[in-house]
Amino acid sequence: MHHISRQDPNYRYVTDWFWPFDRLARAIGISAADLDDLIAAGCGPGAIYAFSSRYGWWSALSGHVDGHEGPPPPEAERWFAPAAVWGFRRATLAQRRGASLEEAARQNAALFTEEFAEALERLPEARFGFADCFDGNSIIDAVARTRAGEEWAAWVEGGYAVCLRIFTGETCVRKESLGAWLKAHIASPESHPLTAEAALSICERLAQLMLPFAPWQRPNGTPGVTIDRLVADLGLGVELPFRGDDGRS
């Protein structure tokens, strides 16, 4: 039997950064039933974090902390990503103009795909995160669109909502590519050299995109293995991403 405490750092994190279902519906301006339909159609992600007395904490990225397989049970308390509000609003607007739920979901995915492809063309760091999308200086369109479909599916399944403050084609490419750049440097500084100033700058750009991650996830997540690691390696203090890190509630 698992118990939740309002003083639990994980509870404080989730309630600081994520919304209950009714708040998300209210932010979009739709009913709970309509939001259920949008989620079921794949217009955006469902629950991102959940807690149940049976299995404890769960996230869409890594499942249950206690190793239990499967989704959270029906009685679990659930929290949703504020970032999802934009896609659900866009889908609601499409429905008002006559689109079906399925068409609204396709329109959201198509917009993401176009943003993703444009970001690959424009961002120099994209080659770190999506090298398979390039042939020399050219984008391989079919590969880029396949990768876009995979990344969109990861958003709808909830994984990216653990990571990103806002999800667009550009923020997806930037997050994956900046993270891969830092990981490559950490793994092999000789092959992927960065000055201290350059490493710090990339960390800052990545931090602008990312949520802190729940306390149980951060050490092994992208912020922990890149930003936290390099800030410490550079002797430039320590990241304090959570309420209470300063010893106060």
Q: What does each model-identified segment do?
A:
Residues 1-2:
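Primarily N-terminal secretory
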Residues 5-16:
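Short, amphipathic alpha-helical "recognition" segments used to contact nucleic acids or chromatin
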Residues 11-13, 49, 55, 160:
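Sequence-level detector for tyrosine residue identity
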Residues 15-35:
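Polyanion-binding surface elements
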Residues 31-65:
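Major-groove DNA-recognition helix of helix-turn-helix-type DNA-binding domains
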Residues 54-249:
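Long, charge-rich, low-complexity intrinsically disordered regions
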